[in-house]
Each structure stands twice: as C-alpha cells, then as structure tokens.
C-alpha cells in the first residue's frame, strides 16, 4: 500500500508558551514551501508546532522557526526534523485532527 507521505519530512518545534509557537509557525511558513499540519498543546505551557514538506524545505523552515522563537525570549525548547518518518509513525500524527484542526 503506497503512502502519500513517504519521503516527506516532518519538522517539529516545541516552545514554552503560545507566543513563541505562533512566531515559529509564522517564520516556518514564510521561510519555505511547507505545510503547517498543526500544533499540540502538550501541557505545562508547552506547545509543539509541526510542519510537513520536502526535506530541504522542512530543514530551512525549522531553522527559521527556531531562530524566530529564540527572539521571543527563551521560548525555544527543542527543534527536530525526521527526514522520512516510518509508516508506523503516521497513525500517531493522524489527519491533523489530534492537533485541533479539521481537514
């Protein structure tokens, strides 16, 4: 069974607070051709923002998002890219619905 997201990278930025998360999301989507797939309120004020796209674009987007987040105080907790998430990871991402979004 073919998976349309195979070969598509996943970029994640975790922040301390909503304002750095919004700043990171804005910078990521402006910096490269990526799709913002959502955000997750992790708890304790932590927010994770996720993007998908080609590996190079996601890499550039996550760098830009992390830089932007750092300019908003000490909001950056972590930034990470998974170049080709294994197909078993995809169900954990869902359709974006667990992120509070609807298709």
UniProtKB/Swiss-Prot annotation:
One of its GO terms (biological process) is photosynthesis. Keywords: Bacterial microcompartment, Carbon dioxide fixation, Carboxysome, Photosynthesis. Pfam families: BMC. Its main location: other. It comes from the Bacteria. Transmembrane segments: none annotated. Induction: Transcribed during light cycle, reaching a peak after 6 hours of illumination, mRNA becomes undetectable during the dark. Part of the csoS1-ccbL-ccbS operon. InterPro entries: Bact_microcomp_CS, BMC_dom, BMC_shell, CcmK-like_sf, CcmK/CsoS1_BMC. Residues 9-94 form the BMC domain. One of its GO terms (molecular function) is structural constituent of carboxysome shell. GO terms for cellular component: carboxysome. Disulfide bonds: none annotated. Homohexamer with a small central pore. Forms a CsoS2-CsoS1-RuBisCO complex. One of shell proteins of the carboxysome, a polyhedral inclusion where RuBisCO (ribulose bisphosphate carboxylase, ccbL-ccbS) is sequestered. Assembles into hexamers which make sheets that form the facets of the polyhedral carboxysome. PANTHER family: BACTERIAL MICROCOMPARTMENT SHELL PROTEIN PDUJ, PROPANEDIOL UTILIZATION PROTEIN PDUA. Belongs to the bacterial microcompartments protein family. CsoS1 subfamily. The tight homohexamer forms a small pore which is positively charged. This is Carboxysome shell protein CsoS1. It comes from Synechococcus sp. (strain WH7803). The gene is csoS1.
